[in-house]
């Protein structure tokens, strides 16, 4: 053994070839600060070996290196800029030493090689991969850019266009695509990986492969003419401006850095990468996006812990076909859980099967599946008008019309057709689970399971724990949701649960703005372009359905009369009474027509202004800041109330539910991350200006206490240790 660290070791393999093996405690390798330091120490030992002829890098895990240790990021990002820059220089000196070894080097890459893992293998001369490889640089999705030389080496290896596509989009690619673009040099079966790697190294050692020529382009300026450079970078900047926008600075910074570094060799190019990385790491966007990643890990870990002793349902059923039922059935079948889809008429069953078939055909068109796979999946969805086979199902989700009487009747009838241990769930979006459970003989086997539309796209499923829901019931439904590829978040019961409970105060703020004379077009524009929502409130209401919102508004008002009971007729009432139900019938705040792809396209409709005039004061202008404040304060206050009342268990779960269920702008990180970034005291000052607007604008006492004591909702993060100690971690 030449060197043994906590996360890697170095040893002789054969005939002058050494192997450096990443083998961290636990299930995965991460390129954390300690591993970077250990890699430097291993290279120091290696540089003294006069008999060294070649080096093989490999992993003892199912994945090579999954990336940097993102749990370290928030503390690293608090380190002063100069110290962070020094540490990056140190880390890059380690990878440069790997790249500068006087012998050929090869990385045998299996599973994931992402972020720092990818940057590590870019420093070797050759890369041999297994078919399960996923390799790429996802840093821009975390609000930063590659910092270990990825923005320098990748363009010089692949050419500007392919590298920009990966770096700017934060993409990873599979083995075959990586081979095609030159990111890896070969793909071999797992059992042949080491044998193949040694064979390539031997060829390089004997001179059959020119490893020096392979290495040289990574040390030089990017080989692009002025015209080629202008075309590549102009197109890339245009694409990034269109897709990322101003709220996500990292992709544009990465493109501009690669452009500026193109005319320099490795050392100066790395300096430019360093100068760009450090300011990005100190942005609120980076902290928010890293926070989302960590929250996602926390939520998924919590679900895994909850279901560790539970068998995943093997047979499911959906009550109520149509678009929603068909979407749920598709998602379950697609992920390997056969499903019975029951309805009371053929028309709805046909609609549900058509929806499932449409989604599968899209997968076929994209090359994700072949015809055989499509036929196999669709055959596991069984449409039926009766309860045949329900005695075999493990879990049933009801997705019928949002009417408590109908839901109670359907659930009570179904309970008589299933085994005593079968779990029942309701896809209700607003009706309290306790109310629906009153119709059942076994309420302990019942809970809520709220999907979001469209089911195949929206990652969140709210699992609602009723007063009598058993732990086993919740665990079974969480297991099914996880199997479907969803992110389940368990909440406690109340009208609207968590997501809709906090959404409708937001809509109430919108209604009040319109009542006071705001133009809905400007409100949408501000909330989309300035705050960053994917849709403004008017557009969102049209997508949700004005009729659906009108009904849900009444349910929420009955549940929370002090805050959510209206004392006036509002814009939603006016549109509902005029049968303008949104996209579903082509008329809402906008008029909708199908575009060439069959998707609804919104158009201006002057008639809506006359309708809104009947429930509004004369038009007047509002500043962007006032619009944002009046829209967001009711939502933020309600989110805080949900935490204080125990409806949602933690700020992390609340923020993930908002991002995954409502599209809360990820660069804000969620409501609690946004509050912490603003500061509770600053938020309180803003909110107090609008308290006269009513109870929805009254700040909860718990938030006032946070402001008084200057306490954040997330635990404070301490800066990482000084750079000197990071080196030797």
From Swiss-Prot:
Catalytic activity, EC: 4.2.1.17, 5.1.2.3, 5.3.3.8, 1.1.1.35
Catalytic activity: a (3S)-3-hydroxyacyl-CoA + NAD(+) = a 3-oxoacyl-CoA + NADH + H(+); a (3S)-3-hydroxyacyl-CoA = a (2E)-enoyl-CoA + H2O; a 4-saturated-(3S)-3-hydroxyacyl-CoA = a (3E)-enoyl-CoA + H2O; (3S)-3-hydroxybutanoyl-CoA = (3R)-3-hydroxybutanoyl-CoA
A GO BP annotation: fatty acid beta-oxidation
Region (Enoyl-CoA hydratase/isomerase): 1-189
GO MF entry, a single one: delta(3)-delta(2)-enoyl-CoA isomerase activity
Cellular component GO terms held in the UniProt record: fatty acid beta-oxidation multienzyme complex
Positions of the record's site feature: Important for catalytic activity: 119, 139
Ranges where the record places region Disordered: 708-729
Record Pfam families: 3HCDH, 3HCDH_N, ECH_1
Keywords of the record: Fatty acid metabolism, Isomerase, Lipid degradation, Lipid metabolism, Lyase, Multifunctional enzyme, NAD, Oxidoreductase
Pathway where it operates: Lipid metabolism; fatty acid beta-oxidation
Active-site residue numbers: 450
Binding site for NAD(+): 324, 343, 400-402, 407, 429, 453
Region listing for 3-hydroxyacyl-CoA dehydrogenase, in residue ranges: 311-729
Amino acids binding substrate: 296, 500, 660
Annotated PROSITE patterns: 3HCDH, ENOYL_COA_HYDRATASE
Assigned protein family: In the N-terminal section; belongs to the enoyl-CoA hydratase/isomerase family.
Assembly and binders: Heterotetramer of two alpha chains (FadB) and two beta chains (FadA).
NCBIfam families in UniProt: FadB, PRK11730.1
Function text: Involved in the aerobic and anaerobic degradation of long-chain fatty acids via beta-oxidation cycle. Catalyzes the formation of 3-oxoacyl-CoA from enoyl-CoA via L-3-hydroxyacyl-CoA. It can also use D-3-hydroxyacyl-CoA and cis-3-enoyl-CoA as substrate.
Protein name: Fatty acid oxidation complex subunit alpha
Organism from which the protein derives: Salmonella paratyphi B (strain ATCC BAA-1250 / SPB7)
Gene for this chain: fadB
